[in-house]
C-alpha cells in the first residue's frame, strides 16, 4: 500500500459565507470550485491549500453542533506547517484572528500555536 499524501480534508460548517470569508479572504486559500447542490440543499466549496492538499467545505441546513472538546472522537484539530509561527500569527492578527500564546511542542521541539475557525474548529500553526 502506498498512501503518499493527504489529498483533501472535508469539514462541515454552520455558516457558509462566514467560513468562505475566513478560509478564502483571511487564510488566503484559493477557490477551485463552488457549487450549490439543490438535491442536498447544501453548498460545497473546494479550496486549494497548496499544490498537494485541498480543503472541502460543506454547508448544510442546520448541521448538528460540533462537540467542542479536543478529546472527543473525530477530528481533533487541523495543523498547518509554516516557516515562521511569529510571522503567521502577526498576519492573522492583522485580519482580526486571535491566536493562543506561542509555545514549543514538548516532543518535537518546534514552535506552535492554535486559533479557531468561525465554528470553533481548532487550527494549529506548526513550524
Label for each model-derived stretch:
Residues 32-34, 41-43, 62-68, 101:
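A short, acidic/glycine-rich surface segment
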Residues 50-54, 62-63, 85-86:
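Short, charged/polar surface micro-motifs in flexible loops or helix N-caps
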Residues 2, 35, 46, 89-127:
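Vicinal oxygen chelate
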Residues 41, 74, 109:
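Exposed loop/turn and edge beta-strand positions of beta-sandwich/beta-sheet ligand-binding modules
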Residues 22, 86-91:
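Short amphipathic alpha-helices within nucleic acid-binding modules
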Residues 1-18, 75-80:
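N-terminal beta-strand motif that seeds the catalytic metal site of vicinal oxygen chelate
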Residues 12-53, 94:
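Core segments of cupin and vicinal oxygen chelate
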Residues 52-55, 120-122:
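Short, charged/polar, Gly/Pro-enriched secondary-structure boundary elements
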Amino acid at each position: 500500500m502506498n498512501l503518499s499524501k493527504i489529498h483533501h480534508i472535508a469539514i462541515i460548517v454552520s455558516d457558509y459565507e462566514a467560513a468562505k470569508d475566513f478560509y478564502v479572504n483571511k487564510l488566503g486559500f484559493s477557490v477551485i470550485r463552488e457549487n450549490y447542490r439543490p438535491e442536498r440543499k447544501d453548498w460545497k466549496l473546494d479550496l486549494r491549500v497548496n499544490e498537494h492538499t485541498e480543503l472541502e467545505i460543506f454547508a448544510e441546513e442546520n448541521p448538528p453542533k460540533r462537540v467542542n472538546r479536543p478529546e472527543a472522537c473525530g477530528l481533533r484539530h487541523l495543523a498547518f506547517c509554516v516557516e515562521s509561527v511569529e510571522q503567521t500569527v502577526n498576519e492573522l492578527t492583522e485580519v482580526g484572528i486571535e491566536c493562543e500564546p506561542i509555545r514549543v511542542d514538548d516532543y518535537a521541539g518546534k514552535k506552535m500555536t492554535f486559533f479557531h475557525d468561525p465554528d470553533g474548529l481548532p487550527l494549529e500553526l506548526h513550524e
